[in-house]
């Protein structure tokens, strides 16, 4: 679970303005943080299939947002991939 402070830090790091929560970069970074938290959860709870379905939905949402960002702003896409350490 992401705390309020962690969320604000992610928004400050990836957003263009202090309250920029809707840009693709911020949405991708927030999803990435939630995905990392859930993968840690699954190391201890291997049979939690209900949450695994939510994880798959988040991964697909992140994938579609990354594709959108790549189409619309390639330079921002490359910077974000490098900052988050994604394999692309």
From Swiss-Prot:
Q: Which PROSITE patterns match?
A: RIBOSOMAL_S15 (PS00362)
**UniProt xrefs under Pfam families:** Ribosomal_S15
The Gene Ontology terms for molecular function here are: rRNA binding; structural constituent of ribosome
> What keywords would UniProt list here?
Ribonucleoprotein, Ribosomal protein, RNA-binding, rRNA-binding
- Which residue ranges run through the membrane? none
Q: Which GO terms describe its cellular component?
A: cytosolic small ribosomal subunit
Q: Which InterPro entries match?
A: Ribosomal_uS15, Ribosomal_uS15_bac-type, uS15_NS1_RNA-bd_sf
GO biological process annotations for this chain's record?
Answer: translation
Assembly information from the UniProt record: Part of the 30S ribosomal subunit. Forms a bridge to the 50S subunit in the 70S ribosome, contacting the 23S rRNA.
Which protein family is it in? Belongs to the universal ribosomal protein uS15 family.
Role description: One of the primary rRNA binding proteins, it binds directly to 16S rRNA where it helps nucleate assembly of the platform of the 30S subunit by binding and bridging several RNA helices of the 16S rRNA.
Kindly provide the name given to this protein in its UniProt entry: Small ribosomal subunit protein uS15
Q: Which organism is it from?
A: Leptospira biflexa serovar Patoc (strain Patoc 1 / ATCC 23582 / Paris)
UniProt lineage: Bacteria, Pseudomonadati, Spirochaetota, Spirochaetia, Leptospirales
């Amino acid at each position: 679970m992401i705390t309020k402070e962690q969320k604000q830090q992610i928004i400050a790091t990836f957003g263009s303005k202090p309250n920029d929560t809707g840009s693709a970069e911020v949405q991708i970074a927030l999803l990435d943080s939630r995905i990392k938290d859930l993968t840690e959860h699954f190391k201890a709870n291997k049979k939690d299939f209900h949450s695994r379905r939510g994880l798959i939905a988040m991964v697909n949402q992140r994938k579609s947002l990354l594709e959108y960002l790549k189409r619309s702003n390639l330079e921002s896409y490359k910077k974000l991939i490098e900052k988050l350490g994604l394999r692309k």
